[in-house]
Design a protein with these regions (language model features):
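Alpha-helical bundle segments that constitute or directly flank the non-heme di-iron/ferroxidase center
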Residues: 1-28, 49, 53-60, 148-151
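Short, contiguous alpha-helical
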Residues: 30-88, 114-117, 121-122, 129-165
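Short amphipathic alpha-helical segments at helix-loop
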Residues: 2, 39, 94-101, 137-141
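Short amphipathic alpha-helical segments, especially helix-boundary/capping motifs
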Residues: 3-6, 16-21, 31-35, 89-94, ...
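A generic "alpha-helical surface" signal
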Residues: 4, 8-11, 41-45, 103, ...
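Acidic/histidine-rich alpha-helical segments that form the ligand environment
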Residues: 9-13, 81-129
C-alpha cells in the first residue's frame, strides 16, 4: 500500500506549522481557550498524546498472528487499548501542558510526527487488516488508522489557528 499522500501531508503540516507555532507570543499560547477550555499549549499537547497513542497502536497491531485477527489479550481475547478517547482531558491535565516549555512542546510534536512517518513507511503491509477494538467495541484496522491520522491532526491544527486569530 502506498501511503505517500499521508506521509507528504504530515510532512507539509510539520513544515508549515513549526515556524508559526514557535513564533506565537506566550500570551496567545497560554491565555486563549477554545470551547473545550483548551489553550494552544493544551491542544498541541493533545496532538502529542494522540501521536503517542497512535504510535503504540500502529506498532502493536503488527504483532497479530494472522491478518484480520486481533492479538490475544488475557482479559477479553482481543487487542483492546486503554480508553484514551474518553480520558484525553485527563491526559492533558496530568501532564500539565499549560506550564510546559513551549519550544519543548513544539519540538516533541514535530519529532513524534516525523517518527510516525517512519512507522508508516515501515509498516508490514500484510498486517494492514489487523484491528483493535475501540472503547465502543468497533473494529479499527491498521489501514484505517493510518488513513485517518492526518484528519485528526488537521482538525486540531485548525483549532489552534482559530485561537491565533
Amino acid at each position: 500500500m502506498n501511503y505517500s499522500n499521508i506521509i507528504q501531508a504530515i510532512r507539509s503540516i510539520i513544515e508549515k506549522e513549526e515556524e508559526i507555532l514557535l513564533n506565537l507570543p506566550e500570551e496567545i499560547i497560554t491565555n486563549r481557550f477554545n470551547h473545550q477550555n483548551r489553550s494552544i499549549k493544551m491542544l498541541l499537547g493533545h496532538l502529542i498524546d494522540s501521536a503517542s497513542n497512535n504510535h503504540q497502536r500502529m506498532i502493536r497491531l503488527q504483532y497479530a498472528p494472522r491478518v484480520g485477527h486481533c492479538i490475544p489479550n488475557s482479559e477479553r481475547g482481543m487487542l483492546v487499548f486503554p480508553d484514551y478517547t474518553q480520558d484525553n482531558d485527563l491526559w492533558i491535565q496530568l501532564q500539565d501542558y499549560q506550564h510546559e516549555d513551549w519550544y519543548t512542546l513544539v519540538q516533541l510534536w514535530k519529532f513524534y510526527n516525523l517518527h510516525i512517518i517512519q512507522v508508516i513507511q515501515s509498516v508490514d503491509e500484510t498486517k494492514l487488516d489487523n484491528y483493535w477494538l475501540d472503547y465502543e467495541g468497533n473494529q479499527v484496522t491498521l489501514h484505517d488508522m493510518i488513513m485517518g491520522y492526518t484528519e485528526h491532526l488537521e482538525l486540531h491544527i485548525g483549532h489552534i489557528h482559530e485561537l491565533m486569530e
